[in-house]
Amino acid sequence: MIGQLGTLLMTFREVFPRDATFQWFVVAVLGFIVRLDHHGVSSSIRWLRIRPSTYETFLAFFRSSALKFDTILRHWQTLVSQRCTTRTSSGSIVLIGDGLKVAKEAACMPGVKRLHQESENSGKAPWIVGHHFGIVGMLVGNKEKAFCIPLAAELHEGAVALRQLQQKQPPTVVGVEKITVVTLMGNLLKTVAKQLAEPCVAVLDAYFAVGPTFLIAKTLCGREGQRLLHIITRAKDNVVAYEARPVAYSGRGRPRKYGRKIRLETLFSRAEDFAPMQVCIYGELKTVSVLCLDLLWRPIQENLRFVLVKDGTATFILMCSDLTMAPEEIIKLYATRFKIEVTFKMLKHIIGGLRYHFWTTAWRDPKGKSLAVDQLSDMLDRSKRLIADAMNAIEAFVGIAMIATGLLQMLALEHAEKIRSLHRWWMRTYSSEIPSEEMVKTVIQHEFYHNFRRFKHTAIYRIIQAKRRQQAPELMEMAA
């Protein structure tokens, strides 16, 4: 599997102007996969057996201006879309977006702030101090198994001043700059869809069922004026929509602007309006009752497709901006949203992609407080640069960890039979014929620690061995 991994990594060579930067990128990706503990950059140095004297150089790689991570992500997004994407019946790529919060109590780490977590999981504290990332992934797979390959991530909470330091453009809603968690997610989806240059459907949870999400997606159009980004999201419980305005009008006063107001939650009591439908939800074929309505939604002044679903005693409402999509497909696509939660688990616990420790003494804000925009005017240029470099390093670390996770998922889909033949360790159950990311990681680790010399003719072997060789001054120091 190291040979196949090396082939995929070598496709990134063209986006690095310097060979040294590319080599450290390979070290970073392979380090995430083969290391046996999650202690930041030092884990990769230790388990790859790279010279300890290169530790500072490895750290500098993440902060380096030579690391053009936007270019790397664009190549990564194109690579994934060309190899293993899942498409809708109309040929659209399926994107999934969500937020991920990680506890970080470092006093000198940029972007750390007090965050609220809503979860029924008793292991999650209601309040933490840390980072909130917005992450967008692409649904890939086949009939056997599906993955959500992460494509892009950036800090989404407490990021107003930091985005200025990083020289990132703020999102706009109807021509007005507006930076919130919702608009940043909408802007990230728009950026990814624009790079893919193909029709996309983004699946989001109810937190993003607000006007700015749909308004930002609406602005991305192709050369012929067709929309390139549609949104599917779960509606809030109190959602209200309107019927079409009556064409005929007679009487006194101003003509009505909207039709009859409908509180959609009340429609669940009208059982006779619902029709039975078979849909695939979480891998199981189920019969649910569905009511599909195209109604006007005031926040965007346009029609949306509302799909009301009764699954036994459970009820929920889905919203879709694509009025041509069938209700069963809308339900099926929303059911795949949980795949990004599985990716978060792999990114956090298997890859250790959030175990970074980048900080700077230029960040002196009280713990849990965001950097305000008005503070930038009194800040030294050197402090601004140090904070921006630290933030870029954090996002680069998470981004490279995402690429490592995605590469494992791609290998699982493309080389499933070979991986299962190489995996000789006992497992109580196999979820499908397609191996998990952890199984692929175990196979690569075994090859690396026991049979790495078999790959001595590959570029990945030469890069790692070059980082292991001791230079003359180091040999003299050991001799002394």
Predicted regions mapped to residue ranges:
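Structural motif
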Residues: 16-24, 123-129, 386-398
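Short alpha-helix boundary/capping elements
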Residues: 33-38, 49-52, 66, 104, ...
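Gly/serine-rich nucleotide phosphate-binding loop at the start of the catalytic core
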Residues: 1-63, 69
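Contiguous, well-ordered alpha-helical segments that form the cores/surfaces of helical PPI scaffolds
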Residues: 26-32, 137, 401, 405
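Generic alpha-helix structural propensity
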Residues: 24, 36-40, 53-57, 67, ...
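Glycine/proline-rich, flexible active-site/cofactor-binding loop segments
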Residues: 40, 47-53, 139-143, 152-158, ...
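Active-site-proximal, Lys/Arg-enriched surface segment
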Residues: 64-159
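Single, function-defining residue in the core of a domain
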Residues: 1-13, 108, 147-480
